[in-house]
Amino acid sequence: MAVTGTERVKRGMAEMQKGGVIMDVVNAEQAKIAEAAGAVAVMALERVPADIRAAGGVARMADPTVIEEVMKAVSIPVMAKARIGHYVEARVLEALGVDYIDESEVLTPADEEFHIDKRQFTVPFVCGCRDLGEAARRIAEGASMLRTKGEPGTGNIVEAVRHMRKVNAQVRKVVSMSEDELMTEAKNLGAPFEVLLEIKRLGRLPVVNFAAGGVATPADAALMMHLGADGVFVGSGIFKSENPEKYARAIVEATTHYEDYELIAHLSKGLGGAMKGIDISSLLPEQRMQERGW
């Protein structure tokens, strides 16, 4: 029998969300909308990434009251974010009973050198990555699910596309290498050799990799599935749109039926305005959340 909190169990829990949509919510009402639309999980926050970006300052773990309200409102899994390197925030979230913890670059990092040792927790962790080096380091630390970093709160899919393509291209390269070449590749990527060896033997990443950071429309979600995403996170794209209920349902349907272009065309009709987007080139270096983490 598998033991609660083992790597196998935690990875299996994340695998159960495959093919689905995970939505950011800030209260019980939004959580109910997400669940009714078919979300496989919700991410409980005080503010969606677009509002965190607009407010500036230091972004921290959400008030536990908000998280508990969301947990009571829905029957689907509830995730919550901890700051990069903030071990105590993660322990608090675990004590609250959340189903997953996202060690997230959307929040202001608490440690500029170390990420959380996720192997010490029974709850599974989600982490962002831009390339295979970051992905492998997070897996070695105990991450059970990955997601592209994209550029959160922008409604601009370009960075999520870049990150998904890069990770997948690097995975293909590793799979094609002989085992004696992997040590040099591990050095080049700053990645643990054992993780690359596992990727080579499996022919893929050992954990699921979702798309996140800039998904704003049904077509965006379908695009990321075409590029090899195992599922989709939608942060600001739902509740910053003109019609959250319609957008939520449409994005869930487009994620499931991402190869049915007639359906996606139908889903895209009459939705109202998508969230206002931001051109990535207009962001200052310190405004680029994807740069957080190492």
Swiss-Prot record:
Keyword Hydrolase belongs to the record: no
GO biological process: amino acid metabolic process; pyridoxal phosphate biosynthetic process; pyridoxine biosynthetic process
Residues annotated as binding D-ribose 5-phosphate: D24, G153, G214, G235, S236
PROSITE patterns: PDXS_SNZ_1 (PS01235), PDXS_SNZ_2 (PS51129)
Pathway(s) served: Cofactor biosynthesis; pyridoxal 5'-phosphate biosynthesis
SUPFAM superfamilies: Ribulose-phoshate binding barrel (SSF51366)
Gene3D superfamilies from the UniProt entry: Aldolase class I
Any Pfam family hit: SOR_SNZ
Single GO term (MF): pyridoxal 5'-phosphate synthase (glutamine hydrolysing) activity
Matching InterPro entries: Aldolase_TIM, PdxS/SNZ, PdxS/SNZ_N, RibuloseP-bd_barrel
Positions of D-glyceraldehyde 3-phosphate binding: R165
CDD domains xrefs: pdxS
Subunit structure: In the presence of PdxT, forms a dodecamer of heterodimers.
Record's function text: Catalyzes the formation of pyridoxal 5'-phosphate from ribose 5-phosphate (RBP), glyceraldehyde 3-phosphate (G3P) and ammonia. The ammonia is provided by the PdxT subunit. Can also use ribulose 5-phosphate and dihydroxyacetone phosphate as substrates, resulting from enzyme-catalyzed isomerization of RBP and G3P, respectively.
PANTHER family listed in its UniProt record: PYRIDOXAL 5'-PHOSPHATE SYNTHASE SUBUNIT SNZ1-RELATED
Family: Belongs to the PdxS/SNZ family.
Protein name (database record): Pyridoxal 5'-phosphate synthase subunit PdxS
Name of the encoding gene: pdxS
